[in-house]
């Protein structure tokens, strides 16, 4: 794995600033190695693993070179910080561009709509400007129609005048006929006087029939009253059933229309029957009065008719009873339907409550799973960092052992220069490898942190939805605040622990690299002092960057 394996993720300015710098530094180091002293001797003093011992040794002996790996580490930290800032800036720019693009699209749609409206208005205006040329033809056509109507009116007037003359002639004829009718009326009045005498004789027989008819009419009135009361009761029951259905059953089948239709049909039937009965009784009454003057056989016929009317009345009474039974059956059916719908509504309400409870349970489980997922991510990130640290330790130990074996075999200026060149080349490879190994955990750590932020946002959204669905009480609000504070404290502690682990790993790596370089380097005291100062400054920068990352995580 080379140090430039993540070049697709770096910008051009980043490559120019950070990636090309190690190449120049390594070439300068090689030139320094070429001008070093001719004799090569291995350093037999024990190597310390701390950074303070490295600094004291480099300042006292003056023969150690600056740590390439510490420079690479500072560069990787700066690269990770720049990458984070660049990614945040690019994300903000993309969001801004997306918002602007959406607003531009909306504006284009609005302008298209306005363009269509303006085109329609322009078409209407053009049609209006082209219409005056047709007005003249319309007016001329209307004038011709009016002239024809005037001619028709003149002809109609002449016809009406002729008709008037004919009506005047008819009036004169009717006046003559009226005079003749007056004479015939006088003759009829004489005959009427004679008929009145016969009418007086028939009045006695008529009185008896009238008494009988009065009794029958009283009976008819009584039956009519009973019938009207029963109809009123049926109407009241139907109206009460309709009102109760309209008030209580809003979402039930519309039976009110059916009840109204049934009520209207029976009202029409009852009115028709009453009208038919009245007309029939009136006609029979006139027939009886006329027949009473002639003979008593008509009285018997009247009795038969009365019995027939009674029979008809009984039949109508039976029909009313049947209607009443039908009404009761409909009311019973309506009540059963109401009970059934009430049961369905209660069952649906229970189902809704059950689904709401399941939704709350699912939301709480989802929040719990998200929290567990966040904890697992934190544990995974810590384990990955620890594994990377152990891997770096093992690689550094292997490199140190390989350099020790090579140093024991070198004797003389030629062999020392060859070994020195190989060690420099090996140091270059090791530095490039360690740089890639460091850049990968930093990139992975940033990726994991982004996933952690997304998980936290999802948890907060779920909690916000739960808070909207169920307003929390005071105790729950306090518990939530405590949980938030605890989560923030845990996040801060984890961030501090991660920063400390990273710093410890960096120090261990720097110490190992210093030990390896102490075995390989002897010359260049002034250059080493300057590079040591630069390494110290870069380490301070790394520490400041680690503190900034910790503060950002805390925020």
From Swiss-Prot:
Subcellular location: Cell projection, Axon; Cytoplasm, Cytoskeleton
Region annotation Coil 2A: where it falls in the sequence: 254-272
Example GO biological process: intermediate filament organization
Positions with biased composition (Acidic residues): 472-540
Annotated positions of the Phosphoserine modification: 56, 67, 103, 473
Location of Phosphothreonine modifications: 532
Post-translational modification Omega-N-methylarginine, affected residues: 23, 30
Coiled coil in keyword set: yes
Domain IF rod per the UniProt entry, residue ranges: 90-401
Residue segments, region Head: 2-93
Modified residues (Phosphotyrosine): 43
Record InterPro entries: IF_conserved, IF_rod_dom, Intermed_filament_DNA-bd, Intermediate_filament
Keyword Cytoplasm in record: yes
PANTHER family for this protein: GLIAL FIBRILLARY ACIDIC PROTEIN (PTHR45652), NEUROFILAMENT LIGHT POLYPEPTIDE (PTHR45652:SF8)
Protein name as it appears in the record: Neurofilament light polypeptide
